[in-house]
């Protein structure tokens, strides 16, 4: 059914954008501060 192709692509695009935004949000708010705290604590311990 060629009528469904634009809806399929819009659905795929919408879910792709939400997936990318979710990954970006999780990376920026969860993983990056965790890595930064780990790096700062290693730096602080090595200076002792």
From Swiss-Prot:
It comes from the Eukaryota. It is a single-pass membrane protein. GO terms for molecular function: proton-transporting ATP synthase activity, rotational mechanism. Pfam families: Fun_ATP-synt_8. Signal peptide: none annotated. The chain crosses the membrane at residues 13-35. Keywords: ATP synthesis, CF(0), Hydrogen ion transport, Ion transport, Membrane, Mitochondrion, Transmembrane, Transmembrane helix, Transport. InterPro entries: ATP_synth_su8_fun (IPR009230). GO terms for biological process: proton motive force-driven ATP synthesis. One of its GO terms (cellular component) is proton-transporting ATP synthase complex. It is found in: Mitochondrion membrane. Mitochondrial membrane ATP synthase (F(1)F(0) ATP synthase or Complex V) produces ATP from ADP in the presence of a proton gradient across the membrane which is generated by electron transport complexes of the respiratory chain. F-type ATPases consist of two structural domains, F(1) - containing the extramembraneous catalytic core and F(0) - containing the membrane proton channel, linked together by a central stalk and a peripheral stalk. During catalysis, ATP synthesis in the catalytic domain of F(1) is coupled via a rotary mechanism of the central stalk subunits to proton translocation. Belongs to the ATPase protein 8 family. F-type ATPases have 2 components, CF(1) - the catalytic core - and CF(0) - the membrane proton channel. In yeast, the dimeric form of ATP synthase consists of 18 polypeptides: alpha, beta, gamma, delta, epsilon, 4 (B), 5 (OSCP), 6 (A), 8, 9 (C), d, E (Tim11), f, g, h, i, j and k. This is ATP synthase protein 8. It comes from Eremothecium gossypii (strain ATCC 10895 / CBS 109.51 / FGSC 9923 / NRRL Y-1056). The gene is ATP8.
């Amino acid at each position: 059914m060629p009528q469904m192709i634009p809806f399929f692509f819009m659905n795929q695009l919408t879910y792709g954008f939400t997936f990318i935004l979710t990954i970006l949000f999780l990376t920026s708010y969860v993983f990056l501060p965790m890595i930064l705290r780990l790096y700062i604590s290693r730096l602080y311990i090595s200076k002792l």
